[in-house]
Amino acid sequence: MFITRTPYRISFVGGGTDIKSYYKKFGGKVISASINKFLYVIVKKQIGFVKYKYRVNWSKIEFCNKINDIKNPIAREALRYFKIDFPIEITTIADIPANTGLGSSSAFAVGLVHALFSLKNIRATKHEIAIIAA
């Protein structure tokens, strides 16, 4: 089992300019800082007999046997990227609820990528994690 803890962030200026469709057209800069609130991602390889290959717990609980059936796009694409083809459970626990503008989706992406690197026994730099999570 791997547990990551990723901080939330507050953007002081430039919020939204970090969105690819915006900065590709207009450019952009963001000034932000992390805060003392976190999103935790727990990744556990399932052992034994399970009914569903993928269990993803976020605001919803998903049970799927095919990656393409996972509704959470971050989880789906991370599992696809890391070629996870064995039973796995992904759970998130957050200090602050989603949709607050504090970067919960980004924190989830970073935490999940970090956890999946660890699960695959690959040491990754912070830069590598950030690039893949983007």
Question: Residue locations for each model-derived region?
Answer:
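ATP-binding N-lobe of GHMP and related small-molecule kinases
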Residues: 1-102, 114-124
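Short, conserved phosphate/pyrophosphate- and ester-handling motifs at nucleotide-, phospho-/glycolipid
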Residues: 105
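Alpha/beta catalytic cores of group-transfer enzymes, especially the acyltransferase/condensing modules
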Residues: 126-134
